């Protein structure tokens, strides 16, 4: 079964950059591009969309809370109606730059705190899906399988793709272990092994030991981790060696 490889990109701001987006775009098949709320700005959005379009990489809107200082990782209480508008705003803005580059936004992936809160709360998940269908009912949602995001997508008639993480350990319940927890962020060797395990066995490492089932049609390699590009290159090589075809899900 083919597997998509994605990364969070375009997460700089002004003269400040994070990661080597150009090099990462040579390796991934889908790019989750920041839309200016948790990171990114109009110039970075334009540039990253152009780089992705040149390489035939699918463009996804990486939507988050309006929280540049906290990089979108702080929990923010928000009315679902306001969240719907903020998500629609972000998707629409990125789609403008994607179309200017000859491409389009084909999927949406929530970022950071929104990723986790919308996975747990149906009202927030419904707001994300409402924003997506407001713009284009054919948009695909990328997120954690078996959560309120998947349930909301099913109810809205939106295609859902489960996501696994190569460089993160999980809880026994199949959720990402908090970043601050010992062993939650995997080194390169462990990340390579986990990507192959997700692709071939549908399982990922549990932070306390053992493994847990992870339903994923796409695997994320974070672009802000040390040596992220080399890790992504090793993951692609390992997947190929395991007979896994890497291709975009849209």
Curated annotation (Swiss-Prot):
InterPro entries the UniProt entry points to: Glyco_hydro/deAcase_b/a-brl (IPR011330), LamB/YcsF/PxpA-like (IPR005501)
Hydrolase in keyword set: yes
Annotated GO MF terms: 5-oxoprolinase (ATP-hydrolyzing) activity; ATP binding
Cross-referenced SUPFAM superfamilies: Glycoside hydrolase/deacetylase
Pfam families the record matches: LamB_YcsF
EC number: 3.5.2.9
EC primary class: hydrolase
GO biological process entries: carbohydrate metabolic process
Function comment: Catalyzes the cleavage of 5-oxoproline to form L-glutamate coupled to the hydrolysis of ATP to ADP and inorganic phosphate.
HAMAP family per the UniProt record, alphabetical: PxpA
Assembly with partners or alone: Forms a complex composed of PxpA, PxpB and PxpC.
Annotated family: Belongs to the LamB/PxpA family.
Protein name in UniProt: 5-oxoprolinase subunit A
Species of provenance: Nocardia farcinica (strain IFM 10152)
Gene encoding the protein: pxpA
């Amino acid at each position: 079964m083919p597997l998509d490889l994605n990364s969070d990109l375009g997460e700089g701001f002004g003269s400040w950059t994070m990661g080597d987006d150009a090099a990462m775009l040579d390796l991934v098949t889908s790019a989750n591009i920041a839309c200016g709320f948790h990171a990114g700005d109009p110039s970075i959005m334009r540039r990253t969309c152009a780089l992705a379009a040149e390489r035939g990489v699918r463009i996804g809107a990486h939507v988050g809370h309006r929280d540049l200082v906290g990089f979108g990782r702080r929990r923010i209480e928000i009315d679902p109606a306001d969240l719907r508008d903020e998500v629609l705003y972000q998707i629409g803005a990125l789609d403008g730059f994607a179309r200017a580059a000859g491409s389009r936004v084909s999927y949406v992936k929530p970022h950071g705190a929104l990723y986790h809160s919308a996975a747990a709360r149906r009202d927030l998940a419904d707001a994300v899906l409402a924003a997506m269908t407001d713009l284009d009912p054919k948009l695909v949602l990328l997120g954690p399988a078996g959560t309120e995001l998947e349930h909301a997508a099913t109810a809205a008639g939106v295609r859902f793709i489960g996501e696994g993480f190569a460089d993160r350990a999980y809880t026994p319940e199949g959720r990402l272990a908090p970043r601050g927890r010992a062993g939650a962020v995997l080194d390169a060797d462990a990340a390579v092994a986990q990507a192959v395990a997700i692709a071939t066995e549908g399982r990922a490492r549990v932070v306390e030991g053992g493994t847990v089932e992870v339903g994923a049609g796409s695997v994320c390699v974070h672009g802000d981790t040390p040596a992220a590009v080399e890790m992504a290159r090793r993951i692609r090589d390992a997947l190929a060696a395991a007979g896994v075809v890497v291709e975009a899900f849209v």
